[in-house]
Amino acid sequence: MTIRLYDTSARQIRDFTPLLPGCVSIYLCGATVQAAPHIGHIRSGLNFDIMRRWFEYRGYDVTFIRNVTDIDDKIIAKSADHGRPWWAIGYENERAFNDGYDVLGCLPPTYEPRATGHITEMVEMMRTLIERGHAYEADGNVYFDVRSFPEYLQLSNQELDNLLQPSGEGETGKRDPRDFAMWKAAKPGEPTWETPWGRGRPGWHLECSAMAHKYLGSAFDIHGGGLDLIFPHHENEIAQAKAFGDEFARYWVHNAWVTMSGEKMSKSLGNSVLVSEMVKQWRPIVLRYYLGTPHYRSMIEYSEEALREAESAFARIEGFVQRVVEKAGGVVEPSPEVPPAFAEAMDDDLGVPQALAIVHTTVRQGNSALAADDKEAAVARLAEVRAMLGVLGLDPLDPQWAGEGDRGEDLHGVVDTLVRMVLDQREAARARKDWATADAIRDQLNQSGLVIEDSPQGPRWTLGPR
């Protein structure tokens, strides 16, 4: 079946046809590194990580670009407020973002370009746009003339004359208030670079147009980002790139937000939850399940209850995996192919919720096989489950999740040794028919957050939902 994606520019789901057979090129608007990431920031990277994994499963060679905006009004403002170099703030938060992507199992991008490393490409794009009458210089600033580009606002389906005029932000010399800055003239205390129009720094929109062209050429398959980027950022990217002569992106894919009390999670609103804090409270694989399993175009309303539900749901999957591994006496390799129903769901606009339902159905079938002592059927179901979880980045047997944190594997071994000692005491009590003591030990372990299951191979323990 052909992969189908919702294309924002077409406002409908379209069959995906790659520019080059067997290859997929993706540009994802990455982090503006003025602060450490909250889970809303990371959701976008995680959604497109699942997209990438699915294309790779389907046999495509994927080139995945995720940029870093390391110079920006907010970074400069924070530099002034905190008395720290702008580049130090950017680098510190870039590392925090990469830590967030890594801890939640996102594959590294093919390239991760920084805006400040591509000033030459930006200057060349501005020079061409000025020569073609699409941009102009005024008081050291370079603006894009939106009326020179008739296709402007087609992505967001707006009319230019109905567009609210921006407040201005101190910009001077504009021909039209809706023209946007490609280059900002130097101001005291700000970082600057030399250009034919004087020293200054790049505008946000120019950065992405130039970097997409540098790494993916004049045309590429998919441009991604959050819904909030459709206007003005992606509209302005399109205007610059197409006026420059690029075909630019052929599909536009946007993910929905994480919300809190119905509002988009945002540091400025004070309703954000940092990834670094979340992983202290929740296992990273549970966070990935929580953020990655809703459909990418559906909002996620943040709540502790929803996280606990995700934890319980994943525990059912993980428990099945552990039981079959014990039954099989070793690791069961994933199937080379996922079940057809799972593939059909993923091909249909990355239908992760429907695909996940197939995972849970297969887990139930596997549990029934275990209950019937049908080892062969249980192993076959686990192989299918591992194949599906691998596509979603949720296979608990993947080395990515071994330990889940600093020294996690060592810690698990220590805890296992201690719990086994207690379970041995419980087994001794059961052998003496001292049921009261055996039950008391089990209850104490349960109160500690452990689930004890008695099996023909002896007792085993797992972490229970909180």
UniProtKB/Swiss-Prot annotation:
Residues that hold ATP according to the record: K267
Cofactor, free-text remark: Binds 1 zinc ion per subunit.
Main location as per UniProt: cytoplasm
Catalytic EC class: ligase
Secretion signal span: none
GO molecular function: ATP binding; cysteine-tRNA ligase activity; zinc ion binding
GO annotation, biological process: cysteinyl-tRNA aminoacylation
Entry GO terms, CC: cytosol
Motif 'HIGH' region positions after renumbering to this chain: 31-41
Residues holding Zn(2+): C29, C208, H233, E237
Recorded superkingdom: Bacteria
Matching InterPro entries: Cys-tRNA-ligase, Cys-tRNA-synt_Ia_DALR, Cys-tRNA/MSH_ligase, CysS_C, Rossmann-like_a/b/a_fold, tRNA-synt_1_cat_dom, tRNAsynth_Ia_anticodon-bd
Enzyme Commission numbers on file: 6.1.1.16
Cofactor(s) required for function per UniProt: Zn(2+)
Keywords on record: Aminoacyl-tRNA synthetase, ATP-binding, Cytoplasm, Ligase, Metal-binding, Nucleotide-binding, Protein biosynthesis, Zinc
Sequence motif 'KMSKS' region, residues: 264-268
Keyword Lipoprotein recorded: no
NCBIfam families named in the record: cysS (TIGR00435)
Family, as annotated: Belongs to the class-I aminoacyl-tRNA synthetase family.
This protein's name: Cysteine--tRNA ligase
Species: Streptomyces avermitilis (strain ATCC 31267 / DSM 46492 / JCM 5070 / NBRC 14893 / NCIMB 12804 / NRRL 8165 / MA-4680)
Gene name of the record: cysS
